[in-house]
Swiss-Prot record:
Belongs to the ATPase alpha/beta chains family. The lineage of its organism: Eukaryota, Viridiplantae, Streptophyta, Embryophyta, Tracheophyta. Its main location: plastid. NCBIfam families: atpD. GO terms for molecular function: ATP binding; ATP hydrolysis activity; proton-transporting ATP synthase activity, rotational mechanism. It comes from the Eukaryota. It is found in: Plastid, Chloroplast thylakoid membrane. It comes from Chamaedorea seifrizii (Bamboo palm). This is ATP synthase subunit beta, chloroplastic. The keyword Cytoplasm does not apply.
Amino acid sequence: MRTNPTTSSPVVSTLEEKNLGRIAQIIGPVLDVVFPPGKMPNIYNALVVKGRDTVGQQINVTCEVQQLLGNNRVRAVAMSATDGLMRGMEVIDTGAPLSVPVGGATLGRIFNVLGEPVDNLGPVDTRTTSPIHRSAPAFIQLDTKLSIFETGIKVVDLLAPYRRGGKIGLFGGAGVGKTVLIMELINNIAKAHGGVSVFGGVGERTREGNDLYMEMKESGVINEKNIAESKVALVYGQMNEPPGARMRVGLTALTMAEYFRDVNEQDVLLFIDNIFRFVQAGSEVSALLGRMPSAVGYQPTLSTEMGSLQERITSTKEGSITSIQAVYVPADDLTDPAPATTFAHLDATTVLSRVLAAKGIYPAVDPLDSTSTMLQPRIVGEEHYETAQRVKQTSQRYKELQDIIAILGLDELSEEDRLTVARARKIERFLSQPFFVAEVFTGSPGKYVGLAETIRGFQLILSGELDGLPEQAFYLVGNIDEATAKAMNLEVESKLNK
């Protein structure tokens, strides 16, 4: 991290200004630049091309050095479109890697890969900037204690708990509630942990990025009236950007998150949507640089690139970065090198189910498909582990019986199976929960449910103490006391209707 004396955009000093090169070759987003002997820039240095194109329009393209080719040539990848660039144009070596603004000034704003605001809300304070290329924290700085990151979302905390400083894969198609779940997590970390969030939109649709921004403003995650009170910073490098920008936008978002962890000593949530696009962009850049492709056409450096990003996402003694990464699985093939490399880094998976979403059960997290390495008795305790296992067993038995119920009906089941089905249906409904960020749509006030309350609620359902209550009493409530109160209200209403 460095502190700049002025608030203007990073200025190239007169000393560095002397290190000028010339464009020798342009192939799409890749430039070859010739520098004077002995003045070669370092790998990952930012190069700036300024000038005018043939019709007199201003050009300002930032590139990143990727290879030193010999004969005083370097190969660089552009972070924006190379339209209008010509051979012979002057290139300035900035003498440092790309640096982006960090700190409280980034909250509530949208940035591109270069750390420039793109939301038309004026300039951002750039007195404090940080280079996007950093080494992962040293082993001695890490906090190796295994601790649960409580989200206040029942289904997540009970069945697939997140690790503080861990990495979670979020799997789900379009329209099953990924965005709402992401916004609820941003809201809950701000309220319960005093933390902030950084959202990295990597190679996804611009429309989705715009929708997310609008929904965040609507739900109060971004405070329009007082931007500084917002809980999230957004960094976008969408599908229409060159591969260089899509490859580096994840690092820009991570750099902003690292500042909140290391300097502000906060718990940070880092969202990456989509981690597959990071790999895809790396593959494009690798091909453009002329590297020999590896398995399925991916870059030979796939594991290294993924590792250098993922190893920076961790808990230190100052704070933590907990990362939630949306994972696109190409052609639903889990053995594809991109998702397979990602899985090696994940501590938990949250799988969203279209079947549950169709039933109106939100969050539509699949209780049987979602997993977590944290769900072990020595980490979460015997009580939590036992409750989670019994919930899964009951849900699994219900799933097995559904075919029989569809063909023969509920009456043909044994007494024991009928009881299992009744409890499983209550559990399914109790796994739903009203969200704070969905209040504006549903009219139901949001609920944050602590882990102890969650465990108590499911224990009561499994023990049979609540067998007499109607299953709709468990739908979209917070803790179990609300379910019993709702059951009483339903009883009163039914008596009045009679």
